[in-house]
Amino acid sequence: MYEWHWHIEWQTPYEFHGHAITKVIAEEKTPYQRALLVELARFGKALILDGKIQSTITDEFIYHEALVHPLLLSINNPEKILILGGGEGATLREVLKHKTIKNVTMVDIDPVVIDFAKKYLQEWHQGAFDNPKSKLVIEDGYKFIKETKEKFDAVVIDLTDPIKDSPSQMLYTKEFYEEVKRISKWGIVTQATSPSFSLETFSIIYNTIKHVFKKVSAGITYVPAFDGLWGFVYASDEVNPAEFSKEEINNRIKERIDGSLRFYDGETHITMFSIPKHIREVLEKENKISTRENPVAVPA
């Protein structure tokens, strides 16, 4: 008999991915979500929120490098960045690798997740919370965006999936992206769920952002712990990361990144934006828009 328990993550109402849990490190029900920190048999230490794996020690670098670097390397000398979500601190870690960064504000709604990260996820944040360039704000992201008078060079949106009636759901709407655009000089990037398990959700997020920004591109990559492709949407009125060549990206990494990258380089950049035809066709044909009245949601 196997001496472990199982974490069952539902991808759709009729499909799940099972992970063997060898150890429960910490667990807490917060006012916003159920937070669980575990050791998985295959992927090691992992953060799970509301039944969804957020990242694991084995492959978190794939997701976080893909989220951050295509946008920040495409803009000129980013200095002031806003992160929404990103409780593990790994998104903050990647932003701080850019030599031109002067300050980063990270806004997360749940202090329990931040405490989890500071105490247990040192491999993720690598001291980023204590960097003098970092500022942590515990607040609802939508509220912060509407009330702030600050302007940022770019906004990195690293939220949980738009689960129905969750705190994150309204942060995938046209109204929200319009508010984010108001405070962003160069543009935004958001995680956009999985084209493998929720292609309609991915395409609606993409189409919604297309109705707010002039230049919008979708990127994808495979994340093993998620058991499928993961999608990102990059948006700006000024630049399009998808238009940069392999050589341009490699040169910018050499000039502008302080520290090593394990996943992302010029060749990976080209691969991320080389989206299969069937997914491109869905993106091109999508006509639904996520609004506060009718917000998009993942199927499970």
UniProtKB/Swiss-Prot annotation:
InterPro entries given in the database record: PABS, PABS_CS, SAM-dependent_MTases_sf, Spermi_synthase, Spermidine_synt_N, Spermidine_synt_N_sf
Protein name, entry field: Polyamine aminopropyltransferase
Gene: speE
Binding positions (spermidine): H64, E88
Subunit note: Homodimer or homotetramer.
Chain sites annotated for binding S-methyl-5'-thioadenosine: Q33, D108, D140, G141, P167
Location in or out of the cell: Cytoplasm
Role description: Catalyzes the irreversible transfer of a propylamine group from the amino donor S-adenosylmethioninamine (decarboxy-AdoMet) to putrescine (1,4-diaminobutane) to yield spermidine.
Active site: D158 (proton acceptor)
Family of this protein: Belongs to the spermidine/spermine synthase family.
Species, as recorded: Sulfurisphaera tokodaii (strain DSM 16993 / JCM 10545 / NBRC 100140 / 7) (Sulfolobus tokodaii)
Enzyme superclass (EC): transferase
Catalyzed chemical reaction(s): S-adenosyl 3-(methylsulfanyl)propylamine + putrescine = S-methyl-5'-thioadenosine + spermidine + H(+)
